[in-house]
Amino acid sequence: MSEAKKPLLEVKDLKTWFPIRSGIFSKVTGQVKAVDGVSFSLGRKETLGLVGESGCGKTTVGRSILRLIEPTQGSVKFDGIDVLSTEGEQLRALRKRMQIIFQDPYGSLNPRMTVGSILSEGPHIHKMGNDKEIRERIQHLMDRCGLDPINHINRYPHEFSGGQRQRVGIARALSVDPEFIVCDEAVSALDVSIQAQIINLLLDLQDEFELSYLFIAHDLAVVEHISDRVAVMYLGK
């Protein structure tokens, strides 16, 4: 199979269970099966919409793929690399290629850091250039994401509207030059008019940076607008 047609992400029989504990000794008495046997693939520059009601496990799927939550069982391969068995420097390098945009833009941003510091943190960790090069990079990303790179770079998250904060979140995800982004309810907390702006921005950025998205939402109309394919989750499956 050619590289262009080979899936970027392959998820097979993914399970993420959380133990139920009770008693004085916190004995495990059962399991909450948040994700119970999910399988799908995602191509390069493709968007897969993952839709389902609240509590169905769709957010857990996204975070399990990135290993923000450790899965119980299953297989996750990214560009042929076994994500679940990767550790140390290899995992760090892999995480540079896989990013996430969170639902709550305010809760996901450090209130004590300026936008400039938030956006430059990832490039510094991954040694993507000197201070001048990184600053130029994040100023370009701010401009590309609809933020003012001169006036906004030294502001704090509380000084922005919800839509602007989500733009910061998008720029942060792009700051390390990823290939795959989990959009975890990325527009759900925004007004309808702002939702359309953010979705159009994500589509433009996908074309420009050749990104693949796992777009998680509970609103089927939103998912259909941005997605190439749609998968539906119900009770972890």
What would you call each of these model-derived segments?
Residues 175-179:
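A short, proline-enriched helix->beta-strand linker immediately N-terminal to the Walker B motif
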Residues 156-160, 164:
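Conserved ABC ATPase signature
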Residues 170, 182, 198:
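Hydrophobic anchor residue at the start of the ABC signature
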Residues 25-29, 83-99, 125, 131:
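ABC ATPase NBD coupling module
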Residues 53, 190, 194-237:
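P-loop NTP-binding/switch modules centered on Walker-like glycine-rich loops
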Residues 66:
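Helix-to-loop junction immediately C-terminal to a conserved catalytic motif
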Residues 74-82:
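Conserved ABC transporter NBD signature motif
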